[in-house]
A protein has these predicted regions:
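N-terminal hydrophobic/helix-forming segments and targeting peptides
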Residues: 1-467
Length: 467
């Protein structure tokens, strides 16, 4: 006959109470703080997906990765990579087991909500010059007014050459901004819905006000702006039609809070998962299964296009590895496991009504796992099997990695999607997880250093796992 337990003993045995990782593990704060320093440097040097790809390639080359050769048979331990159209990164470490026994993938994205310049962006109005923009991804437009902005991009010139540039990041650079009305004249604007407080057609970036010295020149301010750009970059107005230019916040990544426990920056979504995923891949040595880290593009607008996960570039890479080695790619896909690493909304006490507290995910409790994403009735979700959730959480528990599980917000309020379904459509088992973010999709998002570090730990143990 079993011993009868007290109610308190039953509670300790049966109930599940999530804990804050830094409270549970004494050394976590110190390790997380140290890890965060490298992350902040990455964030400041990778404001766009192109820049993130460049910085990632530099890290990979420094770690000994070689450019992928499609028909080569690779040996265990070799490290290869390729860059997809300058905007996405694929890096792999060849494992001890045949490809047919499965790959281990970690996929994050390096595009972020932003403002793109239109094909014909430059105009003058009342002695001021502006760029017209087209917002990219799910931005709350009013958040982009009256903040310092930087302009990053690439021009493809008439002779076929390209020039990359970034203005507004160096402390000696000028910055740019989108103006707003003063409250004294804002009565009509105040009657607008919040979503229309600043409209898309009003997201015009102020870039100049000086004129050329000669008289009788039309659009003298616009011309003066073009002369300055031509003198520095050798471009003409027509070159804007074959350019990719992004407007991003000019702010650097900064510690947040008296205790410095958090980081505020533009682009945590999803570079807070991309950076630790890449670092975990770089540090992987002689894995059992071949590991693949993907830093993809276009997630914020549906993963379409040649650099998005609805393209085949990642899956072609896997197939090419298999075919060169004379192995079956279908078996390889069926035996593979993927972590879809994307951020989620951290429970925000200031906006508690938007969340269901019991199933929220919290800053500081570790990496957040999502069995499913989607919106309302799980629309567009990849719903992971319970067995896969069990496999991953047991792996994390065995390695003392702090994790939590939940959903994003109230059921009927909205939702969100990830790249998971595009991977699952190829017959690959996939689980969503990532770092919780406060003020997600804003120009200054906030994350907890502990969660960043636990993301790194998660990807590291996954890459080295045998099952």
């Amino acid at each position: 006959m079993s011993e009868k337990l007290t109610a308190k003993e039953y509670a300790e045995k049966l109930l599940y109470t999530p804990e804050y990782a830094a409270d549970k593990q004494a050394d976590v704060k110190e390790k997380a703080a140290a890890f965060a320093e490298g992350y902040k440097k990455f964030m400041d040097s990778a404001k766009t997906e192109r820049e993130a790809a460049v910085v990632s390639e530099q890290m990979l080359l420094a770690a000994g990765y070689k450019a992928f050769e499609p028909k080569k048979v690779y040996a265990p331990g070799e490290k290869v990579y390729f860059i997809q159209e300058n905007k996405a990164v694929v890096a792999a470490t060849i494992g001890q087991k045949p490809y047919e026994e499965g790959f281990r993938l970690v996929i994050a994205h390096i595009d972020c909500p932003r403002l793109d310049l239109r094909p014909n962006p430059l105009y003058e109005s009342d002695h001021m010059s502006y760029f017209r923009t087209h917002y990219y991804g799910g931005v709350r437009k009013y958040q982009w007014a009256t903040i310092p902005l930087a302009i990053h991009g690439v021009f493809t010139r008439a002779d076929g050459s390209s020039v990359n540039f970034a203005i507004g990041e160096d402390e000696n650079d000028p910055v740019f901004c989108i103006t707003d009305l003063l409250p004294h004249l804002g009565a009509e604007q105040n009657e607008r819905k919040l979503s229309e407080g600043i409209k898309g057609e009003e997201l015009n970036v102020l870039i100049g006000s000086d004129t050329v010295e000669e008289e009788d020149v039309k659009e003298a301010v616009k011309l003066n702006t073009l002369i300055l750009l031509n003198q520095k970059y050798g471009i003409t107005e027509r070159d804007f039609t074959r350019a990719e230019i992004e407007v991003v916040p000019a702010a650097k990544a900064r510690d947040v809070g008296f205790d410095r426990s958090m980081i505020g920056a533009y682009g945590h979504d999803d570079r807070v998962d991309a950076y630790p995923a890449l670092l975990a891949e770089i540090e992987t040595k002689d894995p059992v299964h071949t590991t693949i880290c993907v830093l993809t593009d276009k997630e914020e607008i549906g993963s379409d296009g040649v650099t998005g996960m609805q393209s085949m570039y990642v899956f072609h890479f896997m197939q090419l590895l298999c075919h060169a080695a004379g192995q079956d790619d279908i078996l390889a896909f069926r035996n593979s496991v993927c972590l879809s690493a994307d951020v989620t909304a951290a429970y925000d006490p200031s906006w508690a009504s938007a969340f269901e507290k019991q199933n929220g995910t919290y800053a500081g409790r570790g990496i957040a796992i999502f069995k499913y994403t989607g919106s309302r009735g799980k629309s567009s979700a990849s719903d992971a099997n319970a067995e896969l959730v069990g496999d991953i959480t047991r792996m994390l528990d065995a390695n003392n990695v702090a994790w939590q599980i939940g959903e994003m917000g109230r059921l009927d309020l909205g939702g969100g999607g990830t790249i998971a379904k595009y991977v699952a459509n190829r017959g690959i088992k996939v689980l969503d997880l990532g770092v919780p973010v406060l003020s997600m999709h804003s120009p200054f998002e906030v994350i907890h250093k502990t969660d960043l570090y636990m993301a790194y730990r998660t990807f590291s143990v996954f890459c080295q796992s045998a099952d």
